[in-house]
Amino acid sequence: MGVPSFFRWLSRKYPKIISPVIEDTPQVVDGVKLPIDYSAANPNGELDNLYLDMNGIVHPCSHPENKPAPETEDEMLLAVFEYTNRVLNMARPRKVLMIAVDGVAPRAKMNQQRSRRFRSARDAKLANEEKARVLAEREAYGEMIDDAVKAKKSWDTNAITPGTPFMDKLAAALRYWTSFKLATDPGWKNLQVIISDATVPGEGEHKIMNFIRSQRADVQYNPNTTHCIYGLDADLIFLGLATHEPHFKILREDVFAQDNRRRPRQHDMMDMSAEEKQALIEQDAEKPFLWLHVSVLREYLSAELLVPRLPFHFDLERAIDDWVFMCFFCGNDFLPHLPSLDVRENSIDILVDIWKAVLPSLKTYLTCDGKLNLKGVEKVLAQLGNRESDIFKKKYEQELRKKEAQERRKMLKNNPNVTKGKVDRNFTVPLESMPVFDVNGNAAAGSLNLTNKDFANMRKEITLANEGNTKALDALKRRSDENRTQRTSDTRDFSQEELESAIEVSKGDNLSAAASLRERILAKRKAAEDPEGAPEPKNPHKAPSASETEAATPASSETASQVDIPISTGMLTPGFLDTDTGVRLFEPGYHDRYYQAKFHVPTGSIDALRKKVVRSYVEGISWVLLYYYQGCPSWTWYYPYHYAPFASDFTGISDLSVTFDLGEPFLPYEQLMSVLPAASSHNLPDVFRSLMSDPESEIYDFYPEEFPIDMNGEKMAWKALVLLPFIDETRLLAAVRQKYPLLSEAERARNVRRDEVLLISNKNTHYERFLARLYTDPAPQPVNFRHFKSGLAGTALSDAEGFRPNTKMLCPLAAGSLPDISTNLFLKTAYRMPQLPAPSKSILLNGFIPPEAQLSPADRDAIMYKYPQRWNPHTMKHNLVPVGPAAVTQYQPRIGGYRAFLFHQQLMQDRPYPPAHMHSHSSGGPPLAQGPRVTQSRYQPRRFH
């Protein structure tokens, strides 16, 4: 999901949510590595259900970053088997294993998939060009390059999309491998495997969510079932919270351990020997994994989201749903994040603080079972809008300070004459203090009328030039003698021809030193001739003026003028650009400049456009919330803009009515035509390729080879926004569907929707019943089964692919030497999940046993009292001080300190009314306000009646 750095931020804020995975090491006997005993006790604790988001496995196995990529698709699939087996040995599920591969996505997700795949094709093209350049350079140096190496191209990662031949092969390979494990591994005898391949519509993680919701709807469901999901996406954390399952955790690679590894580049791979490649493969096989405990995260959130003295009952489940919803504003796969929010800048904390301040006045929460309370959302965004300009200014100031710090570090690194605060232990005279002229006033040899500092800075170049060519030394001396009477520290006194001739003499024997010297002298001369253009020294501690601030912005070029930026009504120029250049979010007037730069509209049309964008964004956040909590509300809806509105623009949204039409998902080939670039058309049947490449095609404009990439204020190129035209669904489907009659039978078989597949071993409790009802009876009937018996509920149907007992399943891979499997050792059926009778409720089910608490009182206090208290000023006007979740409390100084206060409290408990002498001061001064002080305190005395 598009929440960059969310896992890193979350694990640092709540450190106890992660723990390392304990792995059993395989034993080696006589040089043979024995497999791990799957049936043995799990050192990480027992687990019922494991869910694999397979795209998080297929991608790193097919194009890894830290090791050489597999040569063939068979090798990729063998790597998938090995990786999956390692994950299973860590988790060891006992009841259910669900393998979910991304199928056809909703239209809202296709826009992001389209951007990624077009960008991937562009990067692959650049990588192949770079490889060709490196090989050409090697050949120019006389190295012999094999033709096979020159002809080899990188594997197209866009093949990992539903409907391609690779995905069809992946589905067959997964069915074979799980059947092989069920037939041969005793630890799998009670395991029930569900495979949801690319022919089942929906994203992998959301198909898993649908499965969990369907199991919770079964009346026999065990509320203490333990769940684990494997994947790399940040949205798995939101999905884990959205299940409202008390025993849930996430398994993922340890990204912190991988930060220290240097990723080998492409030309490094070309130079590696077989031993070096094998060492990288072995190193990659040992990378550590982490558990992310959603139950511990729930503990943290119970402290973080606690709002005392609410006018309504505090419901942790509803509060967690609100927290998940607010995180959507910081980024997701379906909508751009709000301009003022960024996870790395603690935007989630800002939203939580606003939510806690606004919630008492809302009378209810922001969400309820996936539906939005738009009145509450409008109030939260209004508060965020009030802070928006301050957020932009603070971000700009931080960027300026960071840039200045980088410049200082660069200057200290490049300038060898800066002592960096250390005492110079060399008692010789520094080079800056050495005289450039002799005692008679004559210029020193080789000085070229430079200052002492210039001479010291260029001592290396002059020394190399003098040592490398005596003719250059003589020329420098002659130039010094000729200008003896015109000495100056400036370089403007000698002509261009003289400089060129002096440098030209030295080119023969020491070109590099002479060229460096020439460049530095010419640079000094240019600065001397144009003193107005030379940069002035900058004081890092001085606040920048208005002109300096303008010059320091990214718009320091011609676009940084104070006038309105030019409006473009057509397609932007292909290549990298930054539309934030002229917006200047840190200056007044940024609102109109933002819409002019991002949406290309004149000033008079901004208000009408803003309303349309806000309405679409409200529809978007409503769609995303329903997608996470109830399933896909519409397969055809999408956000029709590349950018988000400001938080201050969300006015009057409480009156909006948001509804969705469910529609139906695209077929696989229709999605391929929606998201693939023309460079990846080899993944499509031949009949569709001309639609992408033929200029006469009615949808040719959907597949530009060059397109603009907006940095959008980001520093890293991979975060840039790809500005592609949105697909016109009507035109696309009309063009694609007229080609369907030309498809072959094998091609039609990849363009269908199917059910999930259920695989069990012949020792499973359901085996005899399923075999008799589905494959022995002449009229097979669907078999319904409940959760209590095996931990799985649903309906089994006869296999649509023609599974037959007493036959063999053939291995689909030519590599690996894997055997064929007897179909008597396992059973394969089609599987359908139980139907949900009503919308899923965001509650903990009755009968659950809470997990053991992992947070200490100190951990909870660190969250509840996260703001420091010692700098809060004491005010005698209200006598209130902040005290964490209780917000404020009454306090006044008391004679005798805290011990006297405790004594007074004990006295008031023993005697309901204090004696009269306690109301007067012994010195005759004003009476102490003991009564009001006690009644206003939260330490209320007991009254006896």
Swiss-Prot record:
InterPro entries: 5_3_exoribonuclease (IPR027073), Xrn1_helical (IPR041412), Xrn1_N (IPR004859), Xrn2/3/4 (IPR017151)
GO BP annotation list: cleavage in ITS2 between 5.8S rRNA and LSU-rRNA of tricistronic rRNA transcript (SSU-rRNA, 5.8S rRNA, LSU-rRNA); mRNA splicing, via spliceosome; NAD-cap decapping; negative regulation of transcription elongation by RNA polymerase II; nuclear mRNA surveillance; nuclear polyadenylation-dependent rRNA catabolic process; nuclear-transcribed mRNA catabolic process; positive regulation of termination of RNA polymerase II transcription
Segments of this protein annotated with the region Disordered: 473-510, 524-564, 912-945
Cellular component terms (Gene Ontology): Las1 complex; nucleus; RNA polymerase II termination complex
Residue ranges, compositional bias (Basic and acidic residues): 474-495
Keyword terms of this UniProt record: Exonuclease, Hydrolase, mRNA processing, Nuclease, Nucleus, rRNA processing, Transcription, Transcription regulation, Transcription termination
Keyword Cell membrane appears in the UniProt entry: no
Major localization listed first in the record, in broad terms: nucleus
Enzyme class label: hydrolase
Subcellular location: Nucleus
Keyword Nuclease: yes
One Pfam family per UniProt: XRN_M
Biased composition (Low complexity): 543-561
CDD domains the record matches: PIN_XRN1-2-like
Gene Ontology MF term list: 5'-3' RNA exonuclease activity; RNA binding; rRNA binding
EC code: 3.1.13.-
Cross-referenced Gene3D superfamilies: 1.25.40.1050, 3.40.50.12390
Subunit structure: Interacts with RAI1; the interaction is direct, stabilizes RAT1 protein structure and may stimulate its exoribonuclease activity. The interaction also stimulates RAI1 pyrophosphohydrolase activity, probably by recruiting it to mRNA substrates.
PANTHER family in UniProt: 5'-3' EXORIBONUCLEASE 2, 5'->3' EXORIBONUCLEASE
Function: Possesses 5'->3' exoribonuclease activity. Required for the processing of nuclear mRNA and rRNA precursors. May promote the termination of transcription by RNA polymerase II. Essential for vegetative cell growth and chromosome segregation.
Protein family according to the UniProt entry: Belongs to the 5'-3' exonuclease family. XRN2/RAT1 subfamily.
Protein name from the UniProt record: 5'-3' exoribonuclease 2
